[in-house]
Amino acid sequence: MATRRALKAVLVDLSGTLHIEDAAVPGAQEALKRLRATSVMVRFVTNTTKESKQDLLERLKKLEFDISEDEIFTSLTAARNLVEQKQVRPMLLVDDRALPDFKGIQTSDPNAVVIGLAPEHFHYQILNQAFRLLLDGAPLIAIHKARYYKRKDGLALGPGPFVTALEYATDTKATVVGKPEKTFFLEALRGTGCEPEETVMIGDDCRDDVGGAQNAGMRGILVKTGKYRAADEDKINPAPYLTCESFPHAVDHILQHLL
């Protein structure tokens, strides 16, 4: 890992770290204010595919988080960027609430498959349609491959198992655009003037948040909220830079030890 420099940026996961659905993690709003009172740049990175960036921003504002749209980098944005780069017409397996982030993208007569978290679309007929497109040579673009995520009623399947099923059935490999891909983290830093060695990532997913960030050259702080399960910190190598109870505790550590 590269030599550490003074901390200049903090990347923060959203779902499971700052909030769980429509409930904020206790103390998270005040902790964010304390972090913003420092000289570090704060950006928010999320794999959520359940809603558009605008809907997500409105949810966060209702929870009284001081966040602006240009501070959020989503895997939906990364997926749209790749679709435009490849100039393909995607079959969009995403939640209907996420469709505004693909406004203007041509989807008739699809020649690619883009898959995120879309429970209402994950049934045999739709998946079989995607399967046939892939057999005909269409590329498979996974917005992310999370195994599961946290809802108020407990853990729930993420898109990863469905992406893997399509990979297995078609003997193909998906291009993943969200966390834990190194390019996702580097893209999130674009325009900040900050390097990975000057950055800390805070999240509740040991692999996608912490492991991905550390593979990109950042430090990773794992919080025990959201989807965290006991001993998650032992599932990645190198281990998280720090494992702590929640986002406010992570901010406490940053203020006391990294600035």
Curated annotation (Swiss-Prot):
Substrate binds at D13, L14, S15, T46, N47, K179. The gene is HDHD2. Residues 47-71 form a coiled coil. It comes from Bos taurus. Binds 1 Mg(2+) ion per subunit. GO terms for molecular function: enzyme binding; metal ion binding; phosphatase activity. The modification N6-succinyllysine is found at K50. Belongs to the HAD-like hydrolase superfamily. The lineage of its organism: Eukaryota, Metazoa, Chordata, Craniata, Vertebrata. Its cofactor is Mg(2+). This is Haloacid dehalogenase-like hydrolase domain-containing protein 2. It comes from the Eukaryota. Mg(2+) binds at D13, S15, D204. NCBIfam families: HAD-SF-IIA, HAD-SF-IIA-hyp3. InterPro entries: HAD-like_sf, HAD-SF_hydro_IIA, HAD_sf, LHPP/HDHD2. Keywords: Coiled coil, Magnesium, Metal-binding. CDD domains: HAD_PPase. One of its GO terms (cellular component) is cytoplasm.
